[in-house]
Amino acid sequence: SIISIHCHYAPGSIDKWEFCTKQMISFLKNKFSKYSDKLSYISLGGGMFSDMSQELKSQLPFIIPTFDEYANVSSKLINDFFIKEKIFKEQPELLIEPGTALASKALDFLVKVVSIKKIKNQYIVNTTGSKYNVNPSVNRLNSPFEVFNKSKESNLKLKNALVCGYTCIETDILDKDFNADLSEGDLILFKEVGSYSLVMKPQFILPNVPIFEFINNEKLSLIKRGETFEDVFSGYQMLC
């Protein structure tokens, strides 16, 4: 027998999260209840936003809900439904799957500035990183960042610059509206890139990068080594 129902709208905004919950209630009432009066779990899936920084919030056209707001709108609707309808023998557990919501702040991404060029009145910053290291989506937002200058003397004052990756893909852009003082050799730390980053990096141009843990703001500890040539080709049977 079926004891669990799952949906995954990945709604994000609070009004869409409410719609997702109402759709689940409609399914339970009009479809599922015809086949069973037992249900142990209801999962509304994921798609919730993280407790993101103001830099990210300002790039979105709606208010970012808190975790409490997500919980209130879904749990109240589900609870009211079960109290009113009394279709099932026992009230099931309500589950959510906060993947991105928890993982996004787990990682930052550090790149080095290789060159800065000016083309048609716009500065183009080339780096040792790629958007494929953090999120290959064409709809990705500009990440919050911090610049570490090796020297203040040779910095250029960049406004609305493009920060680009090392691949030959025209859309490999890490930041589309970069404003900071910068020079070659500086470091840029892109923050809040833990969601869909490592797992979506293809072995294209360069393999994946190492991961370090910064302990007590003073010590680096390697927790995953960078990929090598051998990692990329070890699965192939070489005919030579």
Predicted features and spans:
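Active-site loop/helix belt of alpha/beta enzymes
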Residues: 1-112
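Charged (often Lys/Glu-rich) extended helix/loop segments that serve as interaction or gating elements
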Residues: 73, 83-85, 89-240
